[in-house]
Amino acid sequence: MISRNSILLRRLYPTTIIRTLATDATESTSVKTKRRRTIFTDELNKGPSFDDFVSGKAKDMLEDPLETARKDPNAKLPSWLKVPIPKGKSFHNVKKDVRELKLATVCEEAKCPNIGECWGGKKSEATATIMLLGDTCTRGCRFCSVKTNRKPAAPDPMEPENTAEAISRWGLGYVVLTTVDRDDLVDGGARHLAETVQKIKQKAPQILVEVLGGDFRGDLSMVEILADSGLDVYAHNLETVEALTPHIRDRRATYRQSLAVLERAKQTNSSLITKTSLMLGFGETDDQVLQTLRDLREIGCDVVTFGQYMRPTKRHMKVVEYIKPEKFDYWRDTALDMGFLYVASGPLVRSSYKAGEAFIENVLKKRKHNVGETPRLAQEIKPSIY
């Protein structure tokens, strides 16, 4: 059926004109579509190819959005959070070793802003925090960019050996091992971690080992296995204050459970240094942070670090506040006055940040040689962490 509008149009204009108008409209749409497709294709061609994804090179070609923000003078990221782009021979050597031995690092998986500094130092200073038990976590904390899955792949049985081999190559004096949570494993991965520590000590007994472990679903017998493995520093992160824990961490992680982990580690091996980390910028109050420090001192925690929460992607929690460097100085001084052995506090500090390793390494060496009491941080070293 011909519409009334069509009949009116034909009466007013000759057929040839209508056809011309229709042709022009079609051509115009075609040009716009072609232009859009051309722009899209051009942008696509700038990125990695299919072969790059297959070979694993694509990850190195894609730029981190956080890095883009640091280079953008109009970005909202405060100036004190901007760091140089990672580069240098040492950086690429560490990266090469990590790839060859098929190891995961929290430096890459968690998009740590200090990767250039930690990987790019001199051989005796360069370090990578190795992430054990794979690169996929069974939990989903709202601040973390590590991949999640209810049933990750089985742990690599060669991982302890490969990790020990990589660390012995780097010639380090101090190394940090961390892990994803593995709630799918009966022991939470505790025995795998303990084996890794033992392998490292066999290959290089002089290396001091810090392990940043999980809570093993509250099974403190697993904490005991790890604490007795030969490690030197037992770390487990509270992440935030008690009131915000249910909103920030996975529901299976609780504030009191984390305190119990740190307490049991110290009870199992009193010579261990126990360590935890807090992120600021979630909206916590000063009173809440102060109470957290009291709770940590009550269970004998030796070391605490403070860092700025930085949103990894738009899917994660928003930053409530960018804490100024002066406030981090305040928390460092406050924690030291409360009796903590060592405190690292600054916007870019992370739980495995290397600025603290020099001091902790010195403490452990003095303990092993029974050289009197170890002075506190303010008297020992003053690392630059900004």
UniProtKB/Swiss-Prot annotation:
Residue ranges occupied by any Radical SAM core domain in the UniProt entry: 122-341
Cellular location(s): Mitochondrion
GO cellular component: mitochondrion
Binding site for [4Fe-4S] cluster 2: 137, 141, 144
E.C. no: 2.8.1.8
Gene3D superfamilies documented for this protein: Aldolase class I
Coiled-coil positions: none
CDD domains assigned: Radical_SAM
Involved pathway(s): Protein modification; protein lipoylation via endogenous pathway; protein N(6)-(lipoyl)lysine from octanoyl-[acyl-carrier-protein]: step 2/2
Enzyme class: transferase
Transit sequence range: 1-21
BP terms from Gene Ontology: lipoate biosynthetic process
Binding site for [4Fe-4S] cluster 1: 107, 112, 118, 352
Reactions catalysed according to its record: [[Fe-S] cluster scaffold protein carrying a second [4Fe-4S](2+) cluster] + N(6)-octanoyl-L-lysyl-[protein] + 2 oxidized [2Fe-2S]-[ferredoxin] + 2 S-adenosyl-L-methionine + 4 H(+) = [[Fe-S] cluster scaffold protein] + N(6)-[(R)-dihydrolipoyl]-L-lysyl-[protein] + 4 Fe(3+) + 2 hydrogen sulfide + 2 5'-deoxyadenosine + 2 L-methionine + 2 reduced [2Fe-2S]-[ferredoxin]
GO MF term set: 4 iron, 4 sulfur cluster binding; lipoate synthase activity; metal ion binding
Cofactor: [4Fe-4S] cluster
Entries under Pfam families matching the protein: LIAS_N (PF16881), Radical_SAM (PF04055)
Keyword S-adenosyl-L-methionine: yes
Keywords: 4Fe-4S, Iron, Iron-sulfur, Metal-binding, Mitochondrion, S-adenosyl-L-methionine, Transferase, Transit peptide
Cofactor binding notes: Binds 2 [4Fe-4S] clusters per subunit. One cluster is coordinated with 3 cysteines and an exchangeable S-adenosyl-L-methionine.
Family to which the UniProt record says this protein belongs: Belongs to the radical SAM superfamily. Lipoyl synthase family.
Name of protein: Lipoyl synthase, mitochondrial
Lineage of origin: Eukaryota, Fungi, Dikarya, Ascomycota, Saccharomycotina
Gene that produces this protein: LAB5
